């Protein structure tokens, strides 16, 4: 536990942190990658270039300083980060490296004096130990599962299927022919790649898209403009290629009773974790209402429509509604969508009126903010809304 003086000293630096903003974490990352370039093999350098990771780390540091007297308030954030860390296979010794550069950054940017540096050193040590302990538990849990493993495990691509103009699914089976660990619907898979021509190893997390079957895994990847990994997977990865995978992880998942109503709300590739949830509900003989609300630009980029329809037909109480923002003439002729424009859940208020309903959201942050605001305005309890951000976490 931290003493009162240490807590007071750390909290006194909050105004300075807020004034500096993400410049603090930009300096930190630049320093760390200069002194420890081997960490470029772990960090998503795309998120470094666009500033997302710097903003996320700054928000985490500021939140820790603000809640240093109430660490339980940080546990949800700790769980989210710890789960992601296990996908990157973060080790305890790497926390020492981060701590060294964090303190050096504070010293170089602010010259706050040894008392402040010592206080932050103690505070960081407490937080690092929380992460190290939780991550050790997750590693042990993953390795102890039937079909589980430590580190990464080689898998072979056994199917590659275009699902839309932008989304392709990939199916993996283990090279060793063994079983694979189960996961919760909504969790993701860590994909480790370093093909020829890549400057660094690249690690990405992709949502699993179906109910666990013990034999293999399926993900779906959107081809992003300028996305190094997504473009390689779309244009160069082939059936028979071997990739290394970290065990499934993630704090966003569905865990509901058969009589709990569920709404799965997504936009674009945000439907991928929802597919695993829908598959689980369908194969688990879910008896309560299930809603599938999806938004896409048009039919060219709308993936998995047939699969969703097939799964929906197996559920006794299923409502699906699709919004196309800019439908094509072919979309109109084939009646591939239900509504034009942005998603408006108020039109389907009767389908979401049950106060016990659980809502799962995934898609661009702006979309999730838009959808969550609508739900709250219709009387949905915030505690019933669960969401996943692809990339560094943001608060809706």
From Swiss-Prot:
Record key words, sorted: Detoxification, FAD, Flavoprotein, Heme, Iron, Metal-binding, NAD, NADP, Oxidoreductase, Oxygen transport, Transport
Active site per database record: 95, 135
Cofactor: heme b; FAD
Entry EC number(s): 1.14.12.17
Family to which the UniProt record says this protein belongs: Belongs to the globin family. Two-domain flavohemoproteins subfamily. In the C-terminal section; belongs to the flavoprotein pyridine nucleotide cytochrome reductase family.
Segments forming domain FAD-binding FR-type: 150-255
Cofactor note: Binds 1 heme b (iron(II)-protoporphyrin IX) group per subunit. Binds 1 FAD per subunit.
InterPro entries according to UniProt: Cbr1-like_FAD-bd_dom (IPR008333), FAD-bd_FR_type (IPR017927), FNR_nucleotide-bd (IPR039261), Globin (IPR000971), Globin-like_sf (IPR009050), Globin/Proto (IPR012292), Hmp (IPR023950), OxRdtase_FAD/NAD-bd (IPR001433)
Gene Ontology molecular function: any one: oxygen carrier activity
Region (Reductase): 147-396
Catalytic activity: 2 nitric oxide + NADPH + 2 O2 = 2 nitrate + NADP(+) + H(+); 2 nitric oxide + NADH + 2 O2 = 2 nitrate + NAD(+) + H(+)
Signal sequence region: none
Record-level GO BP terms: cellular response to nitrosative stress; nitric oxide catabolic process; response to toxic substance
Binding sites annotated in the UniProt record for heme b: 85
Protein name: Flavohemoprotein
Every Globin domain range: 1-136
Function: Is involved in NO detoxification in an aerobic process, termed nitric oxide dioxygenase (NOD) reaction that utilizes O(2) and NAD(P)H to convert NO to nitrate, which protects the bacterium from various noxious nitrogen compounds. Therefore, plays a central role in the inducible response to nitrosative stress.
Site feature: Influences the redox potential of the prosthetic heme and FAD groups: 84, 388
């Amino acid at each position: 536990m931290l003493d009162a003086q240490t807590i007071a000293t750390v909290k006194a630096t909050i105004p300075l942190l807020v004034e500096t903003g993400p410049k603090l974490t930009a300096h930190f990352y630049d320093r760390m990658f200069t002194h420890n370039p081997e960490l470029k093999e772990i960090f998503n350098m795309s998120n470094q270039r666009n500033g997302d990771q710097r903003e996320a780390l700054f928000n985490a540091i500021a939140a820790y300083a603000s809640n240093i007297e109430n660490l339980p308030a940080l546990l949800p954030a700790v769980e989210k980060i710890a789960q992601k860390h296990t996908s990157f296979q973060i080790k305890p010794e790497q926390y020492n490296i981060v701590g060294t550069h964090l303190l050096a950054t504070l010293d170089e940017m602010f010259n706050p004096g040894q008392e402040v540096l010592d206080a932050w050193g103690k505070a960081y040590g407490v937080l690092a130990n929380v992460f190290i302990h939780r991550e050790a538990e997750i590693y042990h849990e993953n390795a102890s599962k039937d079909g589980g493993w430590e580190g990464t495990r080689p898998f072979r691509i056994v199917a590659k299927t275009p699902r839309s103009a932008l989304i392709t699914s990939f199916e993996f089976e283990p090279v060793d022919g063994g079983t694979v660990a189960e996961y919760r619907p909504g969790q993701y898979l860590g994909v480790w790649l370093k093909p020829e021509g890549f400057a660094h190893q690249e690690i990405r997390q992709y949502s699993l898209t179906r109910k666990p079957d013990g034999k293999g895994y399926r993900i779906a990847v959107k081809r992003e403009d300028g996305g190094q990994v997504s473009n390689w997977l779309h244009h160069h990865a082939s059936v028979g290629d071997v990739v290394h995978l970290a065990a499934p992880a993630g704090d966003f998942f569905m865990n509901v009773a058969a009589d709990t109503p569920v709404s799965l709300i997504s936009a674009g590739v945000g439907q991928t974790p929802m597919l695993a949830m829908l598959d689980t509900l369908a194969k688990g003989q879910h008896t309560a209402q299930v809603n599938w609300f999806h938004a896409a630009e048009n039919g060219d980029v709308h993936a998995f429509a047939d699969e969703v329809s097939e799964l929906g037909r197996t559920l006794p109480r299923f409502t699906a509604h699709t919004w196309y923002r800019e439908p094509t003439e072919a979309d109109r002729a084939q009646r591939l969508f239900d509504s034009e424009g942005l998603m408006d859940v108020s039109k389907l208020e009767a389908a979401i009126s049950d106060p016990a309903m659980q809502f799962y959201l995934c898609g661009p942050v702006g979309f999730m903010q838009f959808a969550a605001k609508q739900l709250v305005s219709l009387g949905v309890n915030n505690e019933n809304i669960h969401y996943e951000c692809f990339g560094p976490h943001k608060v809706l």
